[in-house]
From Swiss-Prot:
Pfam families reported in the protein's UniProt record: PLDc_2 (PF13091), PLDc_N (PF13396)
GO cellular component: plasma membrane
SMART domains: PLDc
Domain PLD phosphodiesterase residue range list: 216-243, 392-419
Name of this protein: Cardiolipin synthase
Topology in membrane: Multi-pass membrane protein
Chemical reaction(s) catalysed: 2 a 1,2-diacyl-sn-glycero-3-phospho-(1'-sn-glycerol) = a cardiolipin + glycerol
Known role: Catalyzes the reversible phosphatidyl group transfer from one phosphatidylglycerol molecule to another to form cardiolipin (CL) (diphosphatidylglycerol) and glycerol.
Length: 479
């Protein structure tokens, strides 16, 4: 027997073992499971390595560690809020929010997401104003600055941020920067070294330590900034010149980001600390300076996170619950729309129940297969009666859901399998009609810059586009 035959035989045996593991042990979504089984069967050698790199699930063992004091504090608050909700004694500062107590309960039970209602919220839809505000807050920092982004670039904006962080370190402010190793793969080593030499603590999430990174498919997609424990930022903007709208390929960059002052920032801080402690040997312990109580409004909020290590798909479950609670309308903005069957059915049921569903997607792809799959799934919703709008004023990157003008979600999670099952994500769920109406006004303004994809237009698409959609939809479970 030749070496080639031996290797082929060994690969066949290993692929059969992997296929059995995928079907019986890993408890993947059936569609995803069969997609990987087909890859292993039809391209056995390449498929074997593709699965090891992109398909192997992360350990169910929690990869994030809490110090006992922080853990006890969160647990105590969560149990107290759950009990009050169960006994109908929870006091919402806006009485009509009692109608959404089940959503609050879900996030408490599902993610230990504490409900806070003393928050002030600013909304940014433009990168220039968002980063001007962030840099101004950083410049005023007195104690600490915690920065976390999926993508960081060593370009004009990246260097402006670096200059400001170095300035604050020289003033005695503690500065930590956490970036995703894959998302920030273009970040220059000289940029990182410059920060470290100045005293900025810098860490990469799931870095490539070997030739093959077996965690490459599991990325930290979160974008957080916490300043002095009471100002927090979260949303869709990363750090790079394209997010300022000066990239010729994408043009204007339309995103949504929140600036929060209030107790919700404590949950954002905890999330940063957990992520930092996973990535760094320099473990952050409980520090009262990290958790400041400042009231700046009466906006109700829960900071909800999810990831491949989660037992449940917390953010996706929150999306579905919001859709289920809708009585009048649902407005969605997402750059990628590849819903799994559960979310797709929830939207169809809402439409067929008389709820007006509007979904806005970009008019240009940054990931072609994802874009064509998005169009395919939008076609399903068009047939059910949803309205699909194509944003024409640049690139739409916002991840926003608005329901009935009363509740909303803004964050990093797209409506796709990657965000629900493979990426570490963070969203803010908002319970406040005034803030939600501000988000609604932004959505309505975007409608003026969009064109509707009607049933007639969708049915007129070319054979080439139909072919691209079919292929992209077929592989969408592994995108």
């Amino acid at each position: 027997m030749g070496i080639t035959s031996l290797l082929l035989g060994l690969t066949f045996v290993l692929n059969i073992a992997l296929a059995i593991s995928i079907i019986f042990l890993e408890r993947k979504d059936p569609t995803s499971s069969w997609a990987w089984v087909m890859v292993l069967l039809f391209i056995p050698i390449l498929g074997f390595f593709l699965y090891l790199i992109f398909g192997k699930p992360i350990s169910n063992r929690k990869i994030f560690s809490w110090d006992k004091k922080s853990r006890l504090g969160v647990k105590t608050t969560v149990q107290s809020q759950l009990r009050l909700l169960e006994e109908n004694q929870f006091e919402f500062n806006q009485p009509d929010l009692i109608e959404h107590k089940d959503l609050v309960y879900l996030h408490l039970k599902n993610d230990e997401a504490i409900y806070t209602q003393n928050n002030g919220v600013d909304i940014f839809t433009d990168g220039q104003t968002k980063f001007d505000a962030l840099l101004e807050d950083i410049e005023k920092a007195k104690k600490h600055i915690h920065i976390q982004y999926y993508i960081m670039r060593s370009d004009g904006l990246g260097n402006r941020l670096a200059d400001m962080l170095i300035k604050k370190v020289n003033e005695g402010v503690e500065v930590r920067v956490l970036y995703d190793d894959m998302g920030s793969r273009s970040l220059k080593n000289s940029y990182i070294k410059r920060l470290k030499r100045a005293g900025v603590m810098v860490e990469a999430f799931f870095p490539s330590r070997f030739i093959v990174n077996f965690k490459i498919n599991y990325r930290n997609h979160r974008k957080l900034a916490i300043i002095d424990g009471y100002i927090g930022y979260l949303g869709g903007f990363n750090v790079g010149d394209e997010y300022l709208g000066i990239n010729k390929k994408f043009g204007y960059w339309r995103d949504t980001h929140l600036r929060v002052i209030g107790d919700a920032v404590q949950s954002m801080q905890t999330r940063f600390i957990l992520d930092w402690n996973q990535a760094s040997r320099d473990t952050i312990l409980y520090n009262e300076d990290y958790y400041q109580t400042v009231s700046a409004g009466n906006v109700g909020m829960q900071i909800v996170t999810s990831g491949p290590d989660s037992e449940y798909e917390q953010i996706k479950n929150g999306y579905i619950k919001m859709i289920m609670e809708a009585n009048d309308y649902i407005c969605i903005q997402t750059p990628y729309f590849i819903p799994d069957e559960s979310l797709r059915d929830a939207l169809k049921i809402a439409v067929l129940s008389g709820v007006h569903v509007k979904i806005m997607i970009p008019n240009k792809p940054d990931h072609p297969f994802v874009y064509w799959a998005t169009l395919s799934y939008c076609g399903d919703l068009i047939q059910a009666g949803a309205e699909i709008f194509i944003y024409q004023n640049g690139f739409l990157h916002a991840k926003t859901i608005i329901v009935d003008g009363r509740i909303a979600s803004v964050g990093t999670a797209n409506i796709d399998v990657r965000s629900f099952r493979l990426n570490f994500e963070v969203n803010g769920f908002l319970y406040d009609s005034e803030v939600v109406n501000r988000l609604q006004n932004e959505f309505d303004a975007d409608l003026e810059k969009s064109t509707q994809m009607t049933r007639k237009l969708y049915d007129q698409r070319s054979i080439g586009i139909r072919f691209k959609e079919s292929i992209s939809r077929l592989i969408s479970p592994v995108l």
